[in-house]
From Swiss-Prot:
Heterooligomer composed of large and small subunits. It catalyses: Exonucleolytic cleavage in either 5'- to 3'- or 3'- to 5'-direction to yield nucleoside 5'-phosphates. It comes from the Bacteria. It comes from Deinococcus radiodurans (strain ATCC 13939 / DSM 20539 / JCM 16871 / CCUG 27074 / LMG 4051 / NBRC 15346 / NCIMB 9279 / VKM B-1422 / R1). It holds the Pfam family Exonuc_VII_L. CDD domains: ExoVII_LU_OBF (cd04489). GO terms for biological process: DNA catabolic process. PANTHER family: EXODEOXYRIBONUCLEASE 7 LARGE SUBUNIT. It is found in: Cytoplasm. This is Exodeoxyribonuclease 7 large subunit. The lineage of its organism: Bacteria, Thermotogati, Deinococcota, Deinococci, Deinococcales.
Length: 416
């Protein structure tokens, strides 16, 4: 008899029942783990630190809730982000912090897209995760960062030769067809149209209004689309100018206009660009490349109206000058015609008188040459037998009878 195989048989009948695995006897509760992470962060980042980042988004609910990002080479907005976290500005710090920022930046407010330098503490909460509690801000960093980026863009435009192109165009001396880029229903646009609408109603200027966003991440792309639309209008029929206007705002709001592609589009625009962006002290890159800069939409409109009025006044003055010059030319022409007429008349009279005198002299001469007059002066007339005058010696032949005639009678003679 064969000994039974000591190895377990394959198949369901031959499987041994698995021994249950006992759970580890040592483990951490989730709260304990997260508490431990919080302690590590607290020990690793003691006290407050200055952190440089960009505000990706901001929510205002009495407290300010921010999403901070650090962008890599790909830029912000989810492309090329190398770090991201939540940050909070509690109400007790918020109002002092915002007042400080507004005071240093001429009224700017914290908004998405700003590069900021924040002072605060790192905190990790088991329920809410990591957060950066903001206690202070350095407005000078935000302004300095904007200035550095502006200088870099300016240098690039200068290097490629487009920076001063629009400023080389002649400053408009009159306006008949104008494109205007402005935010929709903005107060600045209303100020502009109060001055411009009467010109359009009078048929003096044709306006084309193009809407664009001047703040936020979409500002650059929106303004580029508006400039492209203005370029198409110019290709259809030449524009006298492109006005780019917006109402007043904080200095940092102007940073959205410091866009390289926008500045390049304005610098190379085929018609003069006039800006009125709401700030007298602070220039933007569009202000720098424009043919003409004004402070506000109202001043831009005033410039337009003043130019049209001056052109009309110059046209009226030119018309008056033309009328006066035409009248002067007519008077001089009439005087010249009268002088020429008098001169021609006097010349004709002199010629007629001279001709009459000459005729009279000829008549007297002719009358003085008649035979009777000649005979009366002592001459004698020789006639042949037929009674014809003999004027040459050859006509007197020998033996032929002739007659000598004087004024008082005649005597027959014969030639020997």
């Amino acid at each position: 008899m064969t000994e039974p195989d000591s190895k377990p048989k394959k198949g369901r009948a031959g499987r041994k029942k698995a021994e249950p695995v006992r759970p580890p006897e040592q483990f951490l509760e989730l709260a304990e783990l997260l508490d431990y992470v919080g302690q590590v962060i607290a020990r690793g980042v003691p006290g407050g630190v200055w952190v440089r980042a960009e505000i990706a988004s901001l929510t205002d609910r009495r407290h300010l809730y921010l999403d901070l990002v650090q962008a890599g080479e790909g830029g912000a907005g989810g492309v090329g982000e190398v770090a991201k976290c939540r940050a909070t500005v509690w109400a007790r710090e918020r109002f002092a912090l915002e007042a400080k920022f507004r005071g240093a930046t001429s009224g700017a407010t914290l908004s998405a897209g700003l590069k900021v330098l924040l002072f605060g503490t790192a905190e990790f909460h088991p329920q809410y995760g990591f957060s950066f509690n903001v206690l202070d801000i350095s407005p000078e960093y935000t302004l300095g960062d904007a200035a550095l980026r502006l200088e870099a863009m300016r240098a690039e435009l200068v290097a490629e030769g487009s920076y001063g192109l629009n400023r080389l165009l002649p400053v408009p001396t009159d306006f008949a067809r104008v494109a205007v880029i402005a935010p929709r229903e903005a107060a600045g646009l209303g100020d502009f149209r109060r001055e411009a609408d009467p010109l359009e109603a009078a048929g003096l200027v044709e306006f084309h209004y193009l809407e664009a966003t001047f703040q936020g991440r979409e500002a650059g792309a929106s303004l580029l689309r508006a400039v492209a639309a203005a370029r198409e209008l110019h290709q259809e029929k030449a524009l006298d100018a492109l006005f780019v206007i917006r109402g007043g705002g904080a200095v940092t709001d102007l940073a959205w206009l410091n866009d390289l592609e926008l500045a390049r589009a304005l610098a190379t625009f085929p018609a003069p660009v006039v800006t009125g962006l709401g700030h007298a002290r602070d220039d933007t890159l569009p202000d720098e490349v424009a043919c003409l800069r004004t402070d506000t939409p109202s001043k831009a409109a005033a410039y337009l109206v003043r130019t049209v009025v001056n052109a009309a006044a110059q046209a009226q003055e030119a018309a008056r000058t033309i009328r006066a010059e035409a009248a002067r030319v007519l008077v001089e022409a009439e005087a010249a015609a009268a002088w020429a007429r008098d001169r021609a008349l006097s010349s004709a009279v002199r010629r007629v008188d001279a001709a009459a005198a000459e005729v009279d002299a000829l008549m007297r001469q002719a009358l003085g040459l008649t035979p009777q007059r000649t005979l009366a002066r002592g001459y004698a007339l020789v006639r042949d037998a037929a009674g014809q005058p003999v004027t040459r010696a050859a006509g007197a032949r020998a033996g032929e009878p002739l007659t000598l005639e004087w004024s008082d009678g005649s005597v027959p003679v014969r030639v020997e």
